[in-house]
């Protein structure tokens, strides 16, 4: 990264055409473009009273694009960090940068998204997020990595992409919201599975079965989050794996985000989950869909001695290098030098 005096941000990413943005020109950059993200981040930081200048930057990434590995959030947080470091003396907190990144993706890029990906990338480590107050979410770093559990995490890219699945992804919160509205609420938080089950006949008629199933997933998933947090705090490997396995089954059966409706020829995520079950049979492990689902990646947790054979088996089906042993970095978006 290097500064420039003409108020232009030129960002070149390996393998992509350069993005050129003139700071403060008020231009509307094409939606779904990296330039729109850069412009949105710079504009929001300027609105907070900082003088944002130009710079040149070159980025290299090994994150699979559109695979559910938060590639857009990583890009956004990197741009925000550069501007924060160069023009704000580091005054913006990781959470502030995450909120700026989310709004850039939602309002400038044009894709509906939550705050989870941006917050985790900005903060680093294993993180819990509480959105009771959407304007002031609580972010807690639980631990820096998985070392305390004696587990490794492998991510397998099944070859599908999230890039054209916006409608499927957006339907999930919309359907959950329809259940919340039935109970006179804006969101599902605070409802119990028992409340939903007690109203099943009426709910089925009003919102449909899939919406009900997704709502049940939501309320139980929040319970599992609390269990995972306790397991990490207590280094309880069995409790952690149990909750992850339950979450994976619930995603497939209730949330229904492992296949694209109507797609019978390509079901990469479902196949990867089934293959994981075969490869990890008898191994202390857990696996589930990763990211927004429908396509992209799966995650699997296992002891170190199981990694080599697991990756070999997954690569044999999804291609050389599809399965990667990954680590959780304790530090989020940061300046290295």
Can you annotate each of these PLM segments?
Residues 60-66, 103-106, 196-197, 293, ...:
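Short, internal active-site loops enriched in acidic
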Residues 2-36, 44, 128-288, 300-337:
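C-terminal nucleotide
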Residues 292-298:
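N-terminal pre-core extensions flanking Radical SAM catalytic domains
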Residues 52-63, 98-107, 249, 268-286:
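Short, hydrophobic/aliphatic alpha-helical segments
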Residues 1-100, 280:
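Anion-binding (especially nucleotide phosphate/pyrophosphate-binding) glycine-rich loop
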Residues 67-155, 337:
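Fold-level recognition of mixed alpha/beta catalytic cores in primary-metabolism enzymes, strongest
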Residues 29-32, 66-74, 92-95, 106-110, ...:
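Alpha-helix capping and helix-loop boundary segments enriched in small/acidic/polar residues
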Residues 53, 95, 117, 238-242:
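Short, solvent-exposed positions on alpha-helices
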């Amino acid at each position: 990264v290097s500064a420039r005096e003409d108020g232009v941000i030129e960002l070149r990413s390996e393998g992509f055409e350069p993005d050129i943005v003139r700071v403060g020109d008020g231009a509307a950059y094409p939606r779904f473009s990296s330039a729109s993200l850069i412009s949105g981040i710079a504009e929001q930081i300027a609105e907070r009273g900082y003088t944002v200048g130009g710079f040149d930057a070159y980025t290299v990434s090994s994150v699979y694009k559109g695979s559910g590995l938060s590639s857009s959030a990583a890009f956004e947080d990197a741009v925000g960090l550069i501007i924060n470091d160069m023009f704000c003396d580091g005054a913006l907190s990781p959470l502030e940068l995450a909120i700026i990144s989310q709004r850039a993706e939602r309002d400038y890029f044009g894709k509906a998204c939550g705050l989870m990906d941006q917050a985790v990338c900005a903060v680093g480590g294993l993180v819990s997020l509480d959105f009771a107050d959407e304007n002031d979410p609580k972010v807690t770093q639980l631990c820096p990595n998985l070392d305390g559990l004696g587990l490794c995490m492998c991510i397998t890219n099944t070859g599908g992409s999230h890039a054209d699945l916006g409608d499927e992804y957006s339907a999930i919160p919309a359907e959950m919201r329809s259940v919340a509205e039935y109970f006179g609420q804006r969101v599902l938080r605070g409802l119990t599975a028992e409340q939903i089950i007690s109203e099943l006949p009426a709910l089925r008629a009003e919102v449909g079965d899939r919406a009900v199933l997704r709502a049940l997933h939501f309320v139980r998933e929040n319970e599992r989050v609390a269990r995972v947090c306790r397991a990490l705090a207590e280094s309880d490997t069995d409790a952690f794996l149990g909750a992850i396995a339950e979450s994976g089954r619930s995603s497939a059966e209730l949330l229904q985000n492992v296949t694209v409706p109507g797609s019978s020829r390509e079901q990469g995520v479902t196949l990867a989950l089934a293959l994981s079950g075969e490869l990890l049979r008898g191994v202390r492990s857990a696996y589930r869909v990763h990211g927004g689902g429908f396509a992209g990646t799966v995650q699997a947790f296992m002891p170190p001695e199981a990694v080599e054979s697991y990756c070999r088996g997954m690569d044999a089906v999804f291609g050389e290098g599809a399965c990667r042993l990954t680590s959780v970095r304790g530090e989020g978006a940061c300046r290295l030098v």
